[in-house]
């Protein structure tokens, strides 16, 4: 386990067309800290939003290689968590914490 606080684990909600579609199936998508584990993500969502989490799936999106003024740079990697909530529960990510 790492020493991350609940607010440090969840970086931001992901609001895309795909995340809107999965929200119909009691799922919410968050950008999370790279070091965060699935149990830490589950504990943070349950503590911050007061909901019951049934599953957490994670994926790491690798950063793209970009060119700026002739120099090659690289964007940071982003860890994304798809959190499945218990039946009948929801999170309104548009209002914030």
Curated annotation (Swiss-Prot):
Q: What does this protein do?
A: One of the early assembly proteins it binds 23S rRNA. One of the proteins that surrounds the polypeptide exit tunnel on the outside of the ribosome. Forms the main docking site for trigger factor binding to the ribosome.
Alphabetical UniProt keywords:
Ribonucleoprotein, Ribosomal protein, RNA-binding, rRNA-binding
* Gene Ontology CC: ribonucleoprotein complex; ribosome
Q: Give one Pfam hit by family name.
A: Ribosomal_L23
Answer whether the UniProt record assigns the keyword Transcription to this protein. Answer: no
Q: Which family does it belong to?
A: Belongs to the universal ribosomal protein uL23 family.
NCBIfam families assigned:
PRK05738.1-3, PRK05738.1-5, PRK05738.2-4
What the entry lists under HAMAP family is as follows:
Ribosomal_uL23_B (MF_01369_B)
Which PANTHER family has this protein been placed in?
60S RIBOSOMAL PROTEIN L23A
Extract the InterPro entries matched here: Nucleotide-bd_a/b_plait_sf (IPR012677), Ribosomal_uL23-like (IPR013025), Ribosomal_uL23/eL15/eS24_sf (IPR012678)
Please give the SUPFAM superfamilies that the UniProt record associates with this protein: Ribosomal proteins S24e, L23 and L15e
Subunit info? Part of the 50S ribosomal subunit. Contacts protein L29, and trigger factor when it is bound to the ribosome.
What protein is this chain from?
A: Large ribosomal subunit protein uL23
Which GO-annotated molecular functions does the record name?
A: rRNA binding; structural constituent of ribosome
Q: Name one GO biological process term.
A: translation
Q: Which gene underlies this protein? A: rplW
Organism domain of life: Bacteria
């Amino acid at each position: 386990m790492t020493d991350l606080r609940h607010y440090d684990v969840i970086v931001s909600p992901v609001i895309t067309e795909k995340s809107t579609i999965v929200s119909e199936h009691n799922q919410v998508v968050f950008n999370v800290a790279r070091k965060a584990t699935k149990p830490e993500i589950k504990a943070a969502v349950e503590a911050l939003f007061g909901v019951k989490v049934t599953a957490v799936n994670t994926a790491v999106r690798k950063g793209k290689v970009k060119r700026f003024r002739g120099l090659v740079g690289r964007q940071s990697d982003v860890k994304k968590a798809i959190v499945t909530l218990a039946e009948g529960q929801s999170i309104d990510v548009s209002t914030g914490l």
